[in-house]
Curated annotation (Swiss-Prot):
Gene: GSH2
Presequence positions on this chain: 1-52
Reaction(s) this enzyme catalyzes, per UniProt: gamma-L-glutamyl-L-cysteine + glycine + ATP = glutathione + ADP + phosphate + H(+)
Superkingdom as given in the UniProt entry: Eukaryota
Cofactor: how bound: Binds 1 Mg(2+) ion per subunit.
Entry EC no(s): 6.3.2.3
Native organism: Brassica juncea (Indian mustard)
One GO molecular-function entry: glutathione binding
Keywords (A to Z) from UniProt: ATP-binding, Chloroplast, Glutathione biosynthesis, Ligase, Magnesium, Metal-binding, Nucleotide-binding, Plastid, Transit peptide
Protein name: Glutathione synthetase, chloroplastic
Family membership: Belongs to the eukaryotic GSH synthase family.
Binding site for ATP: 200, 365, 419-428, 430, 455-458, 481, 508, 514
Pathway in which the depicted protein is active: Sulfur metabolism; glutathione biosynthesis; glutathione from L-cysteine and L-glutamate: step 2/2
GO cellular component, one term: cytosol
Chief place of localization: plastid
Length: 530
């Protein structure tokens, strides 16, 4: 989640994908989380039994396009991006993250949409409201959150500080009557099992709801202009309402708070090159809903903020109705006690938090791993069909206190990803580094184990793509990750919004393990349904 949950966390190497004779390789069964030999002899795993699972089919023969035509596409894409605000701050310009309009450049993008089977797309959209409801129910179970993360807090200082705030809220019996969640659930299509598998559920600072819509509209525009030559139909790129739906959810939360003079506060990093994605939401709030937004860092909140006796949060003298975090998800956002004081201050107020500390913790890696255990989903959900839909999308997830799993991961590290309790690109551990870190933890003792989980490594299909960065295109083999946004708003027992809210496609070269867009690993993309 650099700049907000934006890490493309699970990757493939094209050499692995090309290998088709690994019949005796160690494979992972995401349904039962048990190792099997000769998995290729087993029937394909299915996320929904009614779906006919198929791999994305190539939609273009890239070899037939000459450089002149591709350069025309590139030129049109760059012009469109500049005219429509699909831009980021140029990291070579000192003030590009602090002064709007200074040092802008186009966002990294895929030149054309990536093929994606319509059945998987429908499935990802269908489960989004179920995941929204699950997060809300987890947030109400303080004991589950504290117990699940009890060992993690001893090994991870950042998680420990978040849990301290959560504990204080539990001790004060403070209840969040108005609860707003703007989430994103990330998936990859596993080529081996022909399954849609969830990578993670992001509950804080989910980035690119502004750019997700824009890159979709860019691709639709290019296909309307060049679709005949490309052999593509712009109508096969699904509409993306991420910007308006997130803004609408914040506006309805603002209305529920019922203070027409209050503002929405966006909590930001002091130097934010991705500010324009954030400004799109503020623009919709202002122009469509007549709601004022302010932007403050956590340090500024600590200096200017105050919680009044009635619970009202004021910052710089302005009452705040909704707090929308686009920072606060990484230890780097808390360089001093001032930032932690600000986080606690916000939590103690009556403002609607997006997310609350409980929602934030519900999206941690360890909670995700706990939910994969047999019987845990049933603690929060009654509908058996909904439980089945969620569970069948889970990849293999394990804690590091299972000696058999540790042994398997040391023997076959290429089949695992080692994940710390961190959000953002560049944190996960792959390949031989998995083995080395597991051996290190064995030497140093078990206490540090709780800072990590192990996850099945997902191997998606490799496609040929044009990647556009710094005004230059490159043709490469790449893999993609689909993130489906979800909006959830509740006031006491009344559910006001529970819906999927657009999507974010990210694509990166298949030879790279990490893939955060803001971290420089991946590009923004959209999908072409086939």
């Amino acid at each position: 989640m650099v700049g907000g949950c934006s890490s493309l966390s699970y990757s493939s190497s094209s050499t692995f994908i090309a290998t088709t004779t690994l019949s005796s390789s160690l494979k992972l069964n995401p349904q039962s989380f048990i190792f099997h030999l000769n998995l290729r002899k087993r029937p394909p795993l299915r996320c929904l039994s009614s779906l006919t699972m198929e791999s994305p089919k190539p939609i273009l023969d890239f070899e037939k396009f000459d450089d002149g035509f591709v350069q025309k596409l590139v030129y049109d894409a760059l012009v469109w991006s500049s005219l429509h605000g699909l831009v980021v701050g140029d990291k070579t310009h000192q003030r590009s993250g602090t002064v709007p309009g200074v040092g802008m450049m186009h966002a990294p993008i895929a030149l054309l949409p990536t093929p994606f089977p319509e059945s998987y797309w429908n499935q990802a959209c269908e489960v989004a409201p179920i995941f929204n409801e699950l997060v809300d129910r987890i947030s109400l179970d303080g004991k589950f959150i504290q117990d699940s993360l009890s060992r993690t807090r001893k090994a991870d200082v950042f998680t420990s500080r978040l849990l301290e705030i959560h504990s204080k809220m539990l001790e004060s019996n403070k209840r969040e009557e108005i609860r707003l969640g703007l989430h994103r659930s990330d998936y990859m299509l596993d080529e081996e099992t022909k399954s849609l598998l969830q990578i993670e559920m992001n509950t804080i600072s989910c980035s690119f709801p502004g750019f997700g819509r824009l890159v979709t509209e860019l691709h639709q525009s290019l296909l309307r202009s060049h679709g005949d030559h490309l052999g593509l139909d712009s109508k096969r790129v699904p509409r993306n309402g991420s910007t308006s739906q997130f803004a609408d959810a914040m506006a309805k939360a603002w209305l529920e708070y019922n203070n027409p003079r209050a503002v929405v506060m966006v909590v930001v990093q002091p130097d934010e090159r991705n500010m324009y994605d954030q400004h799109w939401l503020s623009s919709v709030l202002r122009e469509k809903h007549n709601i004022v937004t302010i932007r403050k860092s956590l340090a500024e909140v600590e200096t200017e903020g105050r919680v009044h006796e009635d619970g009202t949060l004021t910052v710089g003298g302005q009452a705040v109705s909704v707090v929308y975090y686009r920072s606060g998800y990484t230890p780097r956002d808390y360089p001093s006690e001032s930032e932690w004081n600000a986080r606690l201050l916000i939590e103690q107020s009556s403002a609607v938090k997006c997310p609350s500390i409980a929602y934030h913790l519900a999206g941690t890696k360890k909670i995700q791993q706990e939910l994969a255990k047999p019987g845990v989903l049933e603690r929060f959900m009654d509908n058996k069909d909904d439980i089945a839909k969620l569970r069948k999308c889970f990849a293999g997830l394990w804690s590091l206190d299972d000696p058999e799993i540790i042994k398997k991961a040391i023997e076959k590290p290429e089949l695992f990803v080692m994940k710390p309790q961190r959000e953002g690109g560049g944190n996960n551990i792959y390949g031989d580094d998995v083995r080395e870190n597991l051996l290190r933890l064995q030497r140093e003792g078990e206490e540090e184990n709780a800072a990590y989980i192990l996850m099945q490594r997902i191997f998606p299909k490799v496609s040929n793509v044009f990647l556009l960065r710094d005004g230059v295109y490159h043709k490469d083999q790449a893999i993609s990750e689909l993130g489906v946004y979800g909006a959830y708003l509740r006031n006491k027992e009344r559910v006001i919004i529970n819906e999927h809210s657009g999507y974010l496609m990210r694509t990166k070269v298949s030879s790279s393990d990490e893939g955060g867009v803001a971290a420089g690993y991946a590009v923004l993309d959209s999908i072409y349904l086939n």
